[in-house]
Regions:
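Conserved nucleotide-sugar donor-binding catalytic segment
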Residues: 5-107
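Solvent-exposed, amphipathic alpha-helical segments
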Residues: 51-54, 144, 148
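Phosphate/oxyanion-binding loops and surfaces in catalytic or ligand/nucleic-acid-binding neighborhoods
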Residues: 77, 81, 114-117, 185
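Proline-centered turn/helix-capping motifs that create local helix->coil transitions or kinks
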Residues: 1-6, 121
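Membrane-interface aromatic/basic loop that binds lipid-linked glycans or pyrophosphate carriers
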Residues: 145-194
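C-terminal, non-catalytic tails of nucleotide-sugar-dependent glycosyltransferases
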Residues: 13-29, 46, 108-136, 188-194
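Catalytic core of nucleotide-sugar-dependent glycosyltransferases
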Residues: 86-94, 99-127, 150-166
């Protein structure tokens, strides 16, 4: 950063001319990869108006995840392509919406709704195995439980760990957290590395 207390955007601009190819892992019919955890940065997207209109834009009634919902819907009507390198900086801070705790896992609800609506296949017949989808849900449940265990409600954490355990995700850790959730007072301690 330049001298001083802030950095004007012009000082952070880098030459992106070397990013002329698409990243094959992040390009194509991405629906199943999005279901399985691929993230798309909203701040770097260029979306055709026809795609935006076809999916009806953002669902602003959602409390969280409206951008992920947007990408899932978009991936059903058009291929998506990503450049082969970083093109933006993204700051994540503790007060952002992605860190707000909720009793329910909005991501689990979103993933289940997408799979019920569209199944586990792209329009080009790439599929996500049902077991892989269940593992994805289990990871999301585990993460939801872990966050609630350390910064939220132990009862919610316990229920989320039970869901993860039923799918066989990190069984020993799930059992330990389930047991500890009965005794650990809220707000004490710091989270260890997951």
């Amino acid at each position: 950063l330049p001298e001083g207390g802030f950095a004007p955007a012009a000082s952070l601009v880098e030459d992106a001319s070397q990013f002329t190819r698409m990243d094959p892992e992040r390009s194509g019919w991405l629906y199943t990869r999005l279901l399985n955890g691929l993230l798309v940065g909203m701040n770097t997207a260029v979306v055709r108006r026809s795609v935006y209109d076809a999916i009806g834009g953002f669902n602003e009634a959602m409390r969280q995840g409206e951008d992920y919902d947007f990408w899932l819907k978009a991936s059903r009507v058009a291929e998506m392509h990503s450049l082969n390198g970083p093109v933006a900086l993204y700051r994540i801070h503790g007060a952002s919406a992605m860190h707000r705790l909720s009793p329910e896992s909005h991501l689990v609800n979103l993933l289940k709704a997408a799979s019920m609506r569209w199944g586990l296949k792209t329009l080009s017949d790439q599929s996500l195995a049902p077991r892989a989808f269940q593992e994805r849900l289990a990871r999301v449940y585990f993460d939801h439980g872990y966050t609630h265990y350390w910064r939220g409600d132990r009862t919610i954490a316990r229920a989320a760990f039970w869901h993860a355990l039923r799918s066989g995700h990190r069984p020993l850790r799930c059992i330990v957290y389930i047991c500890l959730s009965y005794w650990r007072p809220n707000g004490s301690g710091r989270p260890p590395a997951a």
